[in-house]
Amino acid sequence: MSYTIREIEKKDNKSVEIVIRTCLIEFGANHDGTAWSDPDLGRFSEIYNSQGNKYWVAEDETGKIVGGTGIGYLTDEICELQKMYCLPDARGKGVANRLMEAALEYAKKYYKKCYLETLDNMTRAQRFYEKYGFYRVDKPVVITEHYACEVKYLKEL
Protein backbone atom coordinates (compact mmCIF):
# COMPACT_ATOMS: atom_id res chain seq x y z
CA MET A 1 0.00 0.00 0.00
CA SER A 2 1.29 3.46 -0.82
CA TYR A 3 0.56 6.61 1.17
CA THR A 4 0.33 10.26 0.21
CA ILE A 5 1.37 13.01 2.63
CA ARG A 6 -0.46 16.27 2.00
CA GLU A 7 -1.76 19.34 3.78
CA ILE A 8 -5.08 18.96 5.53
CA GLU A 9 -8.25 20.01 3.72
CA LYS A 10 -11.66 20.77 5.21
CA LYS A 11 -12.98 17.39 4.04
CA ASP A 12 -10.35 15.67 6.27
CA ASN A 13 -11.37 17.22 9.59
CA LYS A 14 -13.67 14.43 10.80
CA SER A 15 -11.32 11.68 9.61
CA VAL A 16 -8.39 13.23 11.48
CA GLU A 17 -10.50 13.49 14.62
CA ILE A 18 -11.37 9.78 14.31
CA VAL A 19 -7.68 8.84 13.89
CA ILE A 20 -6.71 10.84 16.97
CA ARG A 21 -9.55 9.54 19.15
CA THR A 22 -8.88 5.94 18.05
CA CYS A 23 -5.22 6.24 19.05
CA LEU A 24 -6.03 7.97 22.34
CA ILE A 25 -8.43 5.16 23.27
CA GLU A 26 -5.74 2.60 22.37
CA PHE A 27 -3.34 4.21 24.87
CA GLY A 28 -5.92 4.89 27.59
CA ALA A 29 -5.68 8.63 27.00
CA ASN A 30 -9.34 9.31 26.29
CA HIS A 31 -9.66 11.87 29.11
CA ASP A 32 -9.05 15.50 30.00
CA GLY A 33 -5.48 16.74 29.90
CA THR A 34 -4.80 15.14 26.51
CA ALA A 35 -5.80 15.89 22.92
CA TRP A 36 -9.08 14.11 23.73
CA SER A 37 -10.52 17.31 25.20
CA ASP A 38 -9.04 19.81 22.73
CA PRO A 39 -11.80 22.19 21.63
CA ASP A 40 -10.28 22.44 18.14
CA LEU A 41 -10.29 18.70 17.45
CA GLY A 42 -12.24 18.32 14.22
CA ARG A 43 -11.42 21.85 13.00
CA PHE A 44 -7.76 21.49 12.05
CA SER A 45 -8.16 22.82 8.51
CA GLU A 46 -9.26 26.12 10.11
CA ILE A 47 -6.72 26.16 12.96
CA TYR A 48 -3.62 25.22 11.00
CA ASN A 49 -3.97 27.80 8.25
CA SER A 50 -1.62 30.64 9.19
CA GLN A 51 2.10 31.19 8.75
CA GLY A 52 4.06 28.97 11.14
CA ASN A 53 1.11 26.60 11.65
CA LYS A 54 0.40 23.64 9.38
CA TYR A 55 -1.14 20.16 9.56
CA TRP A 56 -0.48 17.20 7.27
CA VAL A 57 -2.42 14.01 6.73
CA ALA A 58 -1.35 10.60 5.50
CA GLU A 59 -3.83 9.15 3.03
CA ASP A 60 -3.79 5.58 1.76
CA GLU A 61 -4.57 4.44 -1.80
CA THR A 62 -8.28 4.18 -1.02
CA GLY A 63 -8.47 7.77 0.24
CA LYS A 64 -8.62 6.81 3.91
CA ILE A 65 -6.81 9.12 6.34
CA VAL A 66 -4.48 6.92 8.42
CA GLY A 67 -2.40 9.52 10.25
CA GLY A 68 -1.42 13.11 10.68
CA THR A 69 0.76 15.65 12.43
CA GLY A 70 1.01 19.39 12.84
CA ILE A 71 3.36 22.22 13.65
CA GLY A 72 1.98 24.93 15.90
CA TYR A 73 3.32 28.24 17.20
CA LEU A 74 4.48 28.37 20.84
CA THR A 75 6.90 31.32 20.86
CA ASP A 76 8.71 33.30 18.17
CA GLU A 77 11.55 30.76 18.28
CA ILE A 78 9.81 27.55 19.37
CA CYS A 79 7.10 25.50 17.68
CA GLU A 80 5.32 22.40 18.90
CA LEU A 81 4.98 19.12 17.04
CA GLN A 82 1.27 18.53 17.58
CA LYS A 83 -1.23 15.73 17.21
CA MET A 84 1.08 13.14 15.65
CA TYR A 85 -0.90 9.92 15.35
CA CYS A 86 -1.03 6.94 12.99
CA LEU A 87 -3.62 4.18 13.00
CA PRO A 88 -2.21 0.76 13.98
CA ASP A 89 -2.44 -0.62 10.42
CA ALA A 90 -0.26 2.23 9.11
CA ARG A 91 2.52 1.81 11.66
CA GLY A 92 5.86 0.35 10.64
CA LYS A 93 5.33 1.36 7.00
CA GLY A 94 7.21 4.65 6.94
CA VAL A 95 4.11 6.81 7.31
CA ALA A 96 5.23 8.46 10.55
CA ASN A 97 8.69 9.06 9.09
CA ARG A 98 7.22 10.91 6.14
CA LEU A 99 4.91 12.94 8.36
CA MET A 100 7.81 13.86 10.67
CA GLU A 101 10.03 14.85 7.75
CA ALA A 102 7.32 17.12 6.31
CA ALA A 103 6.74 18.73 9.71
CA LEU A 104 10.42 19.30 10.52
CA GLU A 105 11.19 20.65 7.05
CA TYR A 106 8.40 23.19 7.49
CA ALA A 107 9.34 24.02 11.10
CA LYS A 108 12.92 24.86 10.12
CA LYS A 109 11.63 27.72 7.96
CA TYR A 110 10.08 29.54 10.93
CA TYR A 111 11.57 28.29 14.21
CA LYS A 112 14.82 27.44 15.99
CA LYS A 113 13.46 24.67 18.23
CA CYS A 114 10.65 22.15 18.21
CA TYR A 115 8.91 20.98 21.40
CA LEU A 116 6.51 18.11 21.98
CA GLU A 117 4.62 16.41 24.78
CA THR A 118 3.62 12.76 24.96
CA LEU A 119 2.44 10.12 27.39
CA ASP A 120 4.72 7.92 29.44
CA ASN A 121 3.15 4.72 28.05
CA MET A 122 3.80 5.74 24.43
CA THR A 123 7.28 4.21 24.51
CA ARG A 124 7.43 3.39 20.81
CA ALA A 125 6.64 7.02 20.00
CA GLN A 126 9.35 8.17 22.40
CA ARG A 127 11.97 6.04 20.64
CA PHE A 128 10.74 7.45 17.34
CA TYR A 129 11.14 11.05 18.56
CA GLU A 130 14.61 10.31 19.91
CA LYS A 131 15.59 8.88 16.52
CA TYR A 132 14.84 12.31 15.07
CA GLY A 133 17.05 14.10 17.59
CA PHE A 134 14.48 15.07 20.19
CA TYR A 135 15.79 14.97 23.76
CA ARG A 136 13.87 14.89 27.03
CA VAL A 137 13.44 18.04 29.06
CA ASP A 138 12.27 18.25 32.66
CA LYS A 139 9.98 21.24 32.39
CA PRO A 140 7.50 22.36 29.76
CA VAL A 141 8.61 25.14 27.42
CA VAL A 142 5.19 26.71 27.92
CA ILE A 143 2.18 25.53 29.88
CA THR A 144 -0.26 23.76 27.57
CA GLU A 145 -3.68 22.26 28.21
CA HIS A 146 -2.10 18.79 27.99
CA TYR A 147 -1.27 18.46 31.68
CA ALA A 148 -1.58 14.65 31.48
CA CYS A 149 1.31 14.44 29.01
CA GLU A 150 4.14 13.85 31.44
CA VAL A 151 7.00 13.36 28.94
CA LYS A 152 8.39 16.42 27.21
CA TYR A 153 10.92 16.67 24.37
CA LEU A 154 12.83 19.42 22.60
CA LYS A 155 14.83 19.48 19.36
CA GLU A 156 17.16 22.06 17.87
CA LEU A 157 16.16 22.77 14.28
PLM features per residue range, with description:
Residues 91:
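Glycine-rich ATP-binding loop(s) of histidine-kinase-like ATPases
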Residues 94:
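Conserved G/P- and acidic residue-centered "switch" motifs that form tight phosphate/ATP-binding loops
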Residues 97:
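Residues forming the Rossmann-fold NAD(P)(H) cofactor-binding site
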